[in-house]
């Protein structure tokens, strides 16, 4: 089955499917699923020797303000394979701006059917402070050595803001 056929979720915006592009703690390689073929491409080798602190992916059939599907960070006990689809629930959003404009990153935890480990996390403020600091630090610096690129982290927002972003981006994609 092509990744293009993966639905956005079971019950938006509370129950979503995230297509993983980059595993947690992986080498500094940015992968992206091509939105036309469904194939996993190497987007670039990151100049900064850093690794993603969480699994990184997107929600299919959504369109964020940067013109791409909504980005999602998924903390898990083990790194996930690129191309894997994981059922999640959103708990927050990291608000960011980069050289292309707004670039929010949702944070979602594995659905309770996959792991009870995250049941107590209802909102971004329930995440470990160290994890939030690692995520913030990563996104503040991962483009530091790329000429003409920059990132400004604008702060964290709650689960309701994440759900609102999912609904808005799903509606945006449906209109396109």
From Swiss-Prot:
Say yes or no: keyword ATP-binding present: no
Q: Which GO terms describe its biological process?
A: phosphate-containing compound metabolic process
Q: Which residues form a coiled coil?
A: none
Known cofactor(s): Mg(2+)
Q: Name one GO cellular component term.
A: cytosol
Q: Name the keywords, alphabetized.
A: Cytoplasm, Hydrolase, Magnesium, Metal-binding
- Which residues are involved in binding substrate? 30, 44, 56, 142
GO MF terms listed in the record are: inorganic diphosphate phosphatase activity; magnesium ion binding
Recorded superkingdom = Bacteria
State where Mg(2+) 2 binds.
Answer: 71
Q: What does this protein do?
A: Catalyzes the hydrolysis of inorganic pyrophosphate (PPi) forming two phosphate ions.
The record, for HAMAP family, names: Inorganic_PPase
Q: Quaternary form?
A: Homohexamer.
Q: What's the protein name?
A: Inorganic pyrophosphatase
**Source species of the chain:** Salmonella typhimurium (strain LT2 / SGSC1412 / ATCC 700720)
